[in-house]
């Protein structure tokens, strides 16, 4: 009696599973980079929103918001900083009078100086001294571009370069 076997051999099944695994890996890698690009696009839009809010504040008050009181009560915080991943951002929002966007990942922990950390957050710094209220720095970091950014400061300050992120510098025309 001659019986023909119907079905798949173990080797054929293993080959199919291996091919599916390879395809799944490629698809997941593509989705991951697409998510990073989408978060970066949101970051760039958020930075523009925050800049617009700062300019409106400047028009109404003749100065940018001082962040000297924003970080009070936060251990090891620089008194001129506001970081979107800790309580100082809420104080910044209160001072601005609006709700400001937060980074899509928003995972910085530590002392408030996110440039020394590896997480993602927005970081507002009101410059003190003669520049108080006339200049600010707004830092952000992209996932798909790790190059630093920089700009020449005002009020007699030299160039400021972010070692782990980009930043924009705003200043009043008279500043």
Label the model's feature ranges:
Residues 44-62:
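N-terminal alpha-helical signal peptides/signal-anchor transmembrane segments
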Residues 130-175:
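Short, surface-exposed interaction loops/tails
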Residues 33-36, 56, 66:
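Active-site micro-motifs of SAM-dependent methyltransferase domains
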Residues 5, 42, 131-133:
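A generic fold-level signal
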């Amino acid at each position: 009696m001659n019986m023909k076997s119907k079905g798949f051999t173990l080797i054929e099944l293993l080959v199919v599973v291996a091919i599916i695994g390879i395809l799944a890996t490629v698809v997941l890698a593509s989705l991951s980079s697409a998510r990073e690009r989408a978060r970066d696009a949101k970051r760039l839009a958020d930075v523009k929103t925050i800049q617009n809010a700062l300019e409106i504040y400047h028009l109404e008050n003749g100065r940018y918001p001082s962040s000297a009181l924003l970080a009070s009560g936060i251990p090891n915080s620089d008194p001129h900083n506001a970081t979107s991943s800790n309580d100082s951002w809420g104080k910044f929002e209160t001072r601005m009078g609006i709700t400001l966007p937060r980074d899509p990942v928003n995972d910085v922990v530590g002392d408030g100086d996110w440039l020394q950390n590896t997480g993602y957050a927005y970081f507002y710094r009101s410059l003190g001294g003669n520049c108080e209220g006339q200049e600010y720095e707004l830092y952000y970091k992209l996932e798909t571009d790790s190059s630093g950014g920089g700009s020449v400061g005002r009020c007699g300050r030299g160039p400021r370069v972010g070692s782990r992120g980009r930043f924009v510098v705003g200043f009043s025309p008279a500043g």
